[in-house]
Amino acid sequence: MEAAATPAAAGAARREELDMDVMRPLINEQNFDGTSDEEHEQELLPVQKHYQLDDQEGISFVQTLMHLLKGNIGTGLLGLPLAIKNAGIVLGPISLVFIGIISVHCMHILVRCSHFLCLRFKKSTLGYSDTVSFAMEVSPWSCLQKQAAWGRSVVDFFLVITQLGFCSVYIVFLAENVKQVHEGFLESKVFISNSTNSSNPCERRSVDLRIYMLCFLPFIILLVFIRELKNLFVLSFLANVSMAVSLVIIYQYVVRNMPDPHNLPIVAGWKKYPLFFGTAVFAFEGIGVVLPLENQMKESKRFPQALNIGMGIVTTLYVTLATLGYMCFHDEIKGSITLNLPQDVWLYQSVKILYSFGIFVTYSIQFYVPAEIIIPGITSKFHTKWKQICEFGIRSFLVSITCAGAILIPRLDIVISFVGAVSSSTLALILPPLVEILTFSKEHYNIWMVLKNISIAFTGVVGFLLGTYITVEEIIYPTPKVVAGTPQSPFLNLNSTCLTSGLK
């Protein structure tokens, strides 16, 4: 009986480890021992061995769907109602569907190119940066072939920027929501105090938003000291449940409190559209989980079907919540729809707590990418006894950088748009079509494929340039927000109890 239980327990442990491993983004195994890639070509690297799974060890179709949903649903979803405001009630949803279709198509492109290059270079799997590097090697242009290693570095750079940007967004999100919950609790105490002692009313006070960010800093540092994602399995499961419950409560609120939407603008001003683009691309930037999931799927031939179904669900969720959220709150919509929920009802206050818990746990998962790209190259230069101390120091430093970024730009909507325009557009829209051109230019040249890919990449480049320009301009010269009873000011008032500062 005991012998029979042991394999079952081992199998359960293996499945748990797989569930966490597929959440690892596309990290490429790098050689820090001075050997070349050619010397390693016939050897399976540790990461490659990890992906050589038989049918019993791989993940199922349903598990693949679940991981696709986990990899795409986060703070970007809650910021989409404001994105619809920046585009218009008609143009916004149409554009959101369009960007979703292009993003999914680029995911398919990346998978197809990875398969071709794996066969060409006899590799079991390839990460994102290696796919770009090998695509440059097989291109017909010698100048790109000589700079193939440069392509790998560019992708790694944007992966680091993107993921650290996500982490900065998470810190702003945590601070905004916890601040609102805390102030709602204090206001309820003030109301009770005033009702019992009307002759001595209590003064409303508000703590600076950046103080909340600093309060989260030590807890986040301790969280990222957990180096193995499998050790976060329980927390990750609870985070997924809490975020799912929060979304259900948000949906029922916006559906039950829908005012007349006829006065909403069909199309917003052109200057706000780049902000919409950045937020939308930020939300759809789940390309980092595509190849790991495909590599670990039992029936990898069914992955395109899983990708279409999963991203179809994600797109439907995005469009419905974004549209309903904007229709519900109109121009009062904020950087996260959770901030528009009533502060005097604890059911909706609990939504902010539950979703904040989910985002807090997700921080460590997103942080895994820059940590695995940056840390090995630095710690390899230290003696063994100093490596762990050095690693913890680097982790603390990187977390502090994300916190500093959040403090410098404490506006959730602007941070999301900036990260989406700068790095997410590069990884999700610009690089995949260019990689397809390079990969198949010698095999089956097709002028329509080239035109299609150039159009997608051009869209990404335009969004990158305009989105970056508009968000930087908004950071330097923020649009004034008029609050009842206060004069119009071009400066942000982070101490505003109404939380209108830092949010549009």
Swiss-Prot record:
Which Pfam families would you find in this protein's record? Aa_trans
Q: Which GO terms describe its biological process?
A: amino acid transmembrane transport; L-alanine transport; L-proline import across plasma membrane; L-tryptophan transmembrane transport; proline transport; tryptophan transport
What does the UniProt note on pH dependence state? Optimum pH is 7.4 (for proline transport).
Presence of the UniProt keyword Glycoprotein in the record? yes
The protein's matches in InterPro entries, at most eight in alphabetical order, are given as: AA_transpt_TM
Q: In which tissues is it expressed?
A: Expressed in retinal pigmented epithelial cells.
* Glycosylation: residue positions: N495
- N-acetylmethionine sites (modified residues): M1
A GO CC term assigned to this protein in UniProt: vacuolar membrane
Q: Which GO terms describe its molecular function?
A: L-alanine transmembrane transporter activity; L-proline transmembrane transporter activity; L-tryptophan transmembrane transporter activity; symporter activity
Transmembrane segments annotated in the record for this chain: 87-107, 154-174, 206-226, 231-251, 273-293, 309-329, 358-378, 389-409, 414-434, 456-476
Highest taxon in the source lineage: Eukaryota
Q: Where does this protein chiefly localize?
A: membrane
Please list the reactions this protein catalyses.
L-tryptophan(in) = L-tryptophan(out); L-alanine(in) = L-alanine(out); L-proline(in) = L-proline(out)
Localization: Lysosome membrane
Key words, A-Z:
Acetylation, Amino-acid transport, Glycoprotein, Lysosome, Membrane, Symport, Transmembrane, Transmembrane helix, Transport
Tell me the disulfide pairings in this chain: none
Please report the record's description of how this protein sits within the membrane.
Multi-pass membrane protein
User: What subunit structure does UniProt give?
Assistant: Interacts with CRYBA1.
* PANTHER family found in the cross-reference section: AMINO ACID TRANSPORTER (PTHR22950), NEUTRAL AMINO ACID UNIPORTER 4 (PTHR22950:SF190)
Q: What does this protein do?
A: Uniporter that mediates the transport of neutral amino acids like L-tryptophan, proline and alanine. The transport activity is sodium ions-independent, electroneutral and therefore functions via facilitated diffusion.
This protein's name: Neutral amino acid uniporter 4
Which organism is this protein's natural source? Answer: Homo sapiens (Human)
